[in-house]
UniProtKB/Swiss-Prot annotation:
It comes from the Bacteria. GO terms for biological process: translation. One of its GO terms (molecular function) is structural constituent of ribosome. PROSITE patterns: RIBOSOMAL_L36 (PS00828). Disulfide bonds: none annotated. It holds the Pfam family Ribosomal_L36. It comes from Chlorobium phaeobacteroides (strain BS1). The lineage of its organism: Bacteria, Pseudomonadati, Chlorobiota, Chlorobiia, Chlorobiales. GO terms for cellular component: cytoplasm; ribonucleoprotein complex; ribosome. The keyword Ribonucleoprotein applies. The gene is rpmJ. Keywords: Ribonucleoprotein, Ribosomal protein. This is Large ribosomal subunit protein bL36. Belongs to the bacterial ribosomal protein bL36 family.
Amino acid sequence: MKVYSSIKKRCEHCRIIRRKGKRFVICRVNPSHKQRQG
């Protein structure tokens, strides 16, 4: 998982979610697209 100040969807399967005040990108199709903000 990569940590960025600005997260973006990298494909149409990526989803942006919030957990415990942090924003995440999760992607079932391409797990290397995982990102975290903050």
